[in-house]
A protein has these predicted regions:
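FIC/Doc superfamily catalytic core
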Residues: 1-147
Length: 147
């Protein structure tokens, strides 16, 4: 599906479920631990929330806003029993790739910063904290690069 500003939106609940399952199976294999691959009813909050943002008509700004939303809504909504932050990061990266961009993130230092922001977002109970969303959007805007 493509929006009016040319943004390709190939994310749906099943795609997110598949990403989460792959992450958890890999984790189980590497760590030799039992994992629980389950979704919650909150998964139904993710795609409508992503579709509600990034509709200004400025493609790059809209992409950044949607990527921030994908990364934030999954851990905030606790769409899965485990690996919500990792699922959000990978789904957002795939979304960017589909739209001709990538995030340049140093796997050591910057990933910790990103995971810290997503942890703070997860702690919000009622609504997404707009200050944290702006901080996340700024973080993404400094690291988004064309393929």
């Amino acid at each position: 599906m493509t929006s009016n500003n040319g943004i390709i939106m190939n994310l749906d609940n099943q795609y997110l479920i598949d990403i989460n399952e792959k992450i958890l199976k890999r984790h189980a294999k590497i760590k030799k631990v039992k994992v629980y691959i389950e979704t919650t009813k909150n998964i139904d909050l993710v795609i409508p929330k992503v579709n509600s943002v990034g509709n200004s008509g400025n493609r790059k700004e809209d992409l950044i806003e949607k990527v921030a939303c994908i990364m934030a809504v999954i851990p905030w909504a606790q769409a899965f029993f485990d690996s919500n932050r990792r699922t959000g990061i990978i789904a957002a990266s795939k979304f960017l790739y589909d739209n001709g961009y990538e995030l340049e993130i140093d796997p050591d230092n910057e990933n910790l910063e990103l995971r810290g922001m997503l942890s703070e977002i997860k702690k919000q109970s009622q609504t997404l904290n707009q200050d944290l969303m702006k901080q996340l959007s700024f973080y993404i805007s400094k690291r988004i690069k064309p393929l």
